[in-house]
A protein has these predicted regions:
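N-terminal signal-anchor module of multipass membrane proteins
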Residues: 1-54, 58, 65
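C-terminal ends of transmembrane helices
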Residues: 10, 59-71, 107-118, 193
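Short, amphipathic, aromatic/basic-enriched membrane-interface segments that mark the entry/exit
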Residues: 14-23, 65-75, 93-94, 178-186
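Hydrophobic, membrane-inserted alpha-helices
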Residues: 29-34, 57, 61, 79-87, ...
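Structural signature of hydrophobic alpha-helical transmembrane segments
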Residues: 43-56, 93-102, 181-190
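A glycine-rich, acidic short-motif signal
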Residues: 50-84
Length: 193
């Protein structure tokens, strides 16, 4: 056994795909959920929230790397993916400033302070969502419009089981499939996801 193991950080498998190409494919994959979420809520605010949150993530990464004299990596689109994922995790009624705060937290605290892309301890967008949920619980959980208000499907199923009824009584599967339910911008339509 004269072989020596080479110990190094990931990635251990390499390909000719660049990070930028992979991130572009992720953005393309997120577009159906993004467009449907904006259409579903029929609101220019949702569109503005997606644009500003994504731009804030990219700008935060650029400013941080410029100030720290690091290589500028915004061309790898990872910050854009983080901003878009965060925007899709926000309620359509979230104020614009909340998207900006979330983007700054995601990029600075969760991503860059732990070494940048691939070194972060958790997904930056989900870390920012948790931060926003803890910091602004009311705004992060009050996203139900009048047209889609009511019990969540899981609450309806639970109530049906407790009452001894069929579990799916009162749960409209078609509404869940097409996205006519309450939720964040990117989570309502099973088809789009």
């Amino acid at each position: 056994m004269s072989e020596q193991l080479k110990v190094s950080s990931s990635p251990h498998i390499r390909s000719k795909e660049t990070t930028g190409n992979i991130m572009l494919w992720v953005i393309i994959a997120l577009l159906p959920a993004t467009f449907f979420g904006i259409y579903n809520f029929r609101d220019t605010h949702a569109w503005l929230l997606v644009i500003v949150t994504t731009a804030a993530a990219v700008l935060t990464e650029y400013i941080y790397e410029k100030l720290m004299h690091k290589k500028i990596t915004i061309k790898d689109f990872s910050a854009a993916v983080t901003g878009l994922l965060l925007a899709l995790n926000l309620p359509p009624t979230a104020p614009i400033w909340m998207g900006i705060i979330g983007s700054v937290f995601a990029i600075l605290v969760v991503k860059q302070l732990f070494g940048g892309l691939g070194q972060n301890f958790m997904n930056p967008a989900l870390g920012a969502r948790c931060f926003l949920l803890i910091s602004f619980t009311g705004r992060m959980t009050s996203f139900v419009y009048d047209g889609v208000s009511g019990a969540t499907p899981l609450a309806t199923i639970r109530a049906n089981i407790e009452a001894g009824n069929a579990a799916l009584d009162g749960v409209n599967s078609m509404h869940m499939l097409i996205g006519n339910i309450a939720g964040t911008i990117g989570e309502t339509s099973v088809i789009a996801i």
